[in-house]
């Protein structure tokens, strides 16, 4: 049962809130497009839980060893996974939180196509990603104004916080 990496999905239609076109960016990372990279188990059987993975990196980058390898490990446990490439420096709060909440909503919006259970969406994060995962769990909502994805809940059904930054 080998997992497949589905096409990377932009979190936002067009540019993320508050971003500018690459030619107007004052920092290379300012023009980066936040994405969700799904790691899906083969179709068949009942819908499975899905875990959104938030790599750490001090909000200045994203640690590669806390991204794709973790998603593949989750696949080995029988879970779908999706790695969220959220905005980091020069972006500050609330940009990473907006991206992580959007990733949860987007996973819910694609649940049928991904054979995922929209009622069993979890989030896992390391270090700064753990802080972000805790924030998503704490500030989850039932949907906000906006497009069809925005109107879906950002509440998670499970939280896994791996050495989260919870005190400064």
Residue ranges and their predicted role:
Residues 35-40, 60-66:
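N-terminal carbohydrate-binding/catalytic regions of secreted carbohydrate-active enzymes
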Residues 56, 79, 86-88, 164:
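Active-site loop/turn elements of alpha/beta-hydrolase fold enzymes
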């Amino acid at each position: 049962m080998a997992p497949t990496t589905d096409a990377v999905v932009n979190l936002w239609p067009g540019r993320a809130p508050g971003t500018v076109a690459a030619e107007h960016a004052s920092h290379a990372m300012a023009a980066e497009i936040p994405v969700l990279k799904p790691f899906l188990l083969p179709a068949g059987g009942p819908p499975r839980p899905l875990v959104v993975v938030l790599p750490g990196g001090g909000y200045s980058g994203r640690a590669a060893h806390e991204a794709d390898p973790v998603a593949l490990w989750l696949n080995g446990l029988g879970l779908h996974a999706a790695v969220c490439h959220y905005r980091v420096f020069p972006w500050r709060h609330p940009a990473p939180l907006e991206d992580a909440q959007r990733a949860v909503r987007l996973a819910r919006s694609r649940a049928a196509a991904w054979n995922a259970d929209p009622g069993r969406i979890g989030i896992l994060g390391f270090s700064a990603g753990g802080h972000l995962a805790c924030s998503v769990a704490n500030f989850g909502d039932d949907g906000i104004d906006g497009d069809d994805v925005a109107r879906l809940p950002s509440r998670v059904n499970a939280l896994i916080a791996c050495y989260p930054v919870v005190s400064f």
